[in-house]
Amino acid sequence: ADYYSQRASAGLIISEATIISKQGIGWLNSPGIYNNEQVEGWKKVVNAVHKEGGKIFLQLWHCGRASHSDFHDGKLPVAPSAIKLNGVYIQTPKGKKDYETPSALTIEQIEKIIDDYKRAAACAMKAGFDGVEIHAANGYLIDQFLQTKTNERKDNYGGSIPNRYRFLDEILQGVMEEVSVDRIAVRLSPNGIFNDMGSTDFREQFTFVVEQLNNFSLAYLHVMDGLAFGFHEQGEAMTLADFRKVFKGTLMGNCGYTLETAEEAINKQYADL
């Protein structure tokens, strides 16, 4: 609570990534938002931030394939398709391990995860958060559905660009049952190579996603357009200016900005935050 309250003067805080279920974990000591004990713990953080005059959104997170069976009592991590993450190692509760080939999700499992997002959003509201940010970036589960690099499904959740967007859309629809849409944000990382990502049709995919998000009056769209996390080099990087041409709402830029470059982006009206 002290860590967050010390930063409340920034205006808006986006929490650390917070898992929506036990299945969602892939980092040691990650916080969660799926039971009453966690809700009570987060209340202390939220109250401390509010006491200092700040606002705070909770970032909803599922790691998908970027995990290991050591986190899940021996069960494989899950993903849209059984495609292994090409990485050096993952730090698990039992030490450094090689990544594993994940288990491809069934339709029933997908529906359960969508419900988990909805339940986690309800828990966030119970804890007093001002809103939630759906983490659809950085090679985690939602991003894995969006990109052909990690999604080879042949059903309604794979193949075409609209099908690959479907998972995010259904999560958004579920979260909206618990949280007012103007208190919901989405985070995307079109250019990132982190967690072994990058698809050849990324520009078409993410342009489509943003066009669809225009149908919702989101609190903001959070774009990791900067290249500080590494660029996948599958085409010309998508910039804030590209997103501004498409997205009609409040746009937030992130990743590798300095004070000067951030102010320049805002002054040129490429971003609002």
Segments (PLM) and residue ranges:
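Flavin-dependent oxidoreductase catalytic cores
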Residues: 1-273
